[in-house]
A protein has these predicted regions:
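Short beta-strand/loop segments at the ligand-binding rim of alpha/beta enzyme cores
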Residues: 1-4, 23
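Gly/Ser/Thr/Ala-enriched C-terminal appendages of enzymes
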Residues: 8-188
Length: 188
C-alpha cells in the first residue's frame, strides 16, 4: 500500500494520478470538510408565493430586477430530473409548478431560466422523469424515513453514474442544466 496525505484535495489527487503516481490510499482530511473554492454559502430568502386565505391555492409572486439572474421564479414549485431513456444519463433538472403533470410520450420544451430565449425541445419517448423533492415534514410531523448510511452510499453511486463524463471532470466541466417548464416560464 502506498499512501499520500497532507492537504490533499481533488485537484492535487487528479494531478498525481495524471503523473502516474501509484498511490492507492488517499488521506484527505481538512479539504474533505472545508471548501477553498467556496468558503461561504450565501443564502437569501425570496418570497415566491403566498397562500390564498380563501382556498388552498398559492398566489405566485416574483422579485423583479434589472439583473436577470436576480429575477425569482414565482409560485409553489417542485423539481424533476430528466433522464435520457437510451443512456440513463441526466439531460437536465426541471423546475416546474407543483401541480404540473407530464406525459413522457410527448415532446417537452424547457427554458433556460436566465437566458430565456434559449429553449430545448426533448422528443417524446426519449426521456424519463423522476421527482426529486420528497416530503420531510407535513403539518409539523416528520413523515420521512431516513435511509441507512449504506443506502445513502448506494444512492450516491447510482446518481453519480447518471452524470455524463464531461460533467465530472475537474477542469472545464460541462454543467448540468437546470431549466424551467413551459408553464413556469410563461408565468415568469
Amino acid at each position: 500500500i502506498i499512501s499520500a496525505s497532507s492537504d490533499l484535495d481533488e485537484y492535487l489527487i487528479d494531478s498525481l494520478k495524471a503523473q502516474g503516481a501509484t498511490i492507492n490510499s488517499w488521506g484527505v482530511g481538512t479539504n474533505l470538510i472545508t471548501s477553498k473554492d467556496c468558503p461561504a454559502f450565501g443564502g437569501v430568502y425570496k418570497l415566491a408565493a403566498i397562500k390564498d386565505k380563501d382556498d388552498e391555492d398559492f398566489v405566485p409572486k416574483i422579485k423583479l430586477s434589472e439583473n436577470t439572474e436576480k429575477i425569482t421564479n414565482p409560485g409553489n414549485k417542485t423539481i424533476y430530473r430528466i433522464y435520457d431513456k437510451a443512456t440513463g444519463k441526466i439531460r437536465a433538472d426541471l423546475i416546474c409548478m407543483v401541480n404540473e403533470t407530464f406525459d413522457e410520450s410527448k415532446d417537452m420544451i424547457i427554458f433556460d431560466p436566465i437566458e430565456t430565449w434559449k429553449k430545448t425541445k426533448i422528443k417524446g419517448g426519449t426521456y424519463t422523469l423522476r421527482e426529486l423533492l420528497v416530503p420531510v415534514f407535513q403539518k409539523g410531523l416528520c413523515v420521512y424515513t431516513s435511509p441507512s448510511v449504506m443506502e445513502i452510499r448506494d444512492i450516491c453511486i447510482r446518481e453519480k453514474d447518471t452524470l455524463w463524463d464531461e460533467t465530472k471532470r475537474l477542469a472545464n466541466p460541462h454543467k448540468v442544466y437546470v431549466d424551467l417548464s413551459s408553464r413556469l416560464y410563461h408565468i415568469k
